[in-house]
């Protein structure tokens, strides 16, 4: 009977390692999606994206 109680408590408990792994995978996918959109924007119009860093005067 004690073994059954331990098994049920383990299934109802929060697995911290699994939570960290899922959170890490989700964050990596979000980062990759953001990078894909930024790269597509750069490929579509490279001059508009780089114009903010190249606005230095030529004096």
Swiss-Prot record:
<keyword id="KW-0812">Transmembrane</keyword>
<protein>
    <recommendedName>
        <fullName>Cortexin domain containing 2</fullName>
    </recommendedName>
</protein>
<keyword id="KW-0472">Membrane</keyword>
<dbReference type="GO" id="GO:0016020">
    <property type="term" value="C:membrane"/>
</dbReference>
<dbReference type="Pfam" id="PF11057">
    <property type="entry name" value="Cortexin"/>
</dbReference>
<feature type="transmembrane region" description="Helical">
    <location>
        <begin position="20"/>
        <end position="40"/>
    </location>
</feature>
<dbReference type="InterPro" id="IPR020066">
    <property type="entry name" value="Cortexin"/>
</dbReference>
<keyword id="KW-1133">Transmembrane helix</keyword>
């Amino acid at each position: 009977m004690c073994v059954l109680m331990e098994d049920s408590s383990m299934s109802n408990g929060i697995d911290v390692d699994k939570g960290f792994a899922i959170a890490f995978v989700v964050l990596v996918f979000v980062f990759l999606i953001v990078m894909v959109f930024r790269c597509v924007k750069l490929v579509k119009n490279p001059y508009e994206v780089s114009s903010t860093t190249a606005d230095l005067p030529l004096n």
